Amino acid sequence: MIELEHICVSYGGTPALSDVTTGFPDGGFTCIIGPNGGGKSTLLRAMAGLSPYTGTVRVGGVDLSGLSRRDRAEQLAYLPQSRPIPDIDVRTLISHGRFPHLGFSKTLTAKDRTLVEEAAERTGCAPLLGRRLRELSGGERQRVYLAMVVAQDARAILLDEPCTYLDIRHQLELLALLEDLHRSGRTIIMVAHDLPQAFSCAGSLRLLDGGVLTAEGPPFELCAHPALNRAFGASVRPDDRPDSLYRFRTVSMP
């Protein structure tokens, strides 16, 4: 369980998050939604310990600030929305997922190498292992970065809009990989901007608007929540049409 209590974040005196209190159960799939500038990415970074905050973040009942680097790596893996594209091969990048567990020399053990191979296989990256990262398409690179996160072998995976810049086919492939990880027991917490996609893949949602948590709960409950319309000027409804891409659709409000 990841627990947040009274989380506040400010940048230059301007509040980005205001008194956010919520929790993310072990083994859940949660999407964080909200309008641009609502605080979604800031919340994810605070949970990962990458943004200064006031309040308390607890992971497995332990204050995040009290966890060692290795203990934190066992609990949380974080994939930001924007990443560099270093001039290295795919195997090396995936191996970086093991670095938080290693000593100063960053020498991989047999267990580390096995986890790297398993992560590549699981994410469909095994055929890419010998290729340079800069040679890959956007969808291939995103799978490789996800493989790096999987190789870290953390209990919870935090992802900031992982489907950004991907075409529909690669989005669906990525979501299928995340669902596979979720079924295997990983906790998935994902920032998403596509409402039908978020409502369709998540078991629970958190709505941030203006840095404030305005609603939370399962998709069918949030469909009717007035905070959704206030945030987006639109609402979400179940979509049972057989040719629909997702189980929910966005509808305009009068």
Give the ranges of each region predicted by the language model:
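ABC ATPase nucleotide-binding domains
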Residues: 229-254
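Helix-to-loop junction immediately C-terminal to a conserved catalytic motif
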Residues: 48
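H-loop (His-switch) and adjacent beta-strand-loop-beta switch element
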Residues: 205-218
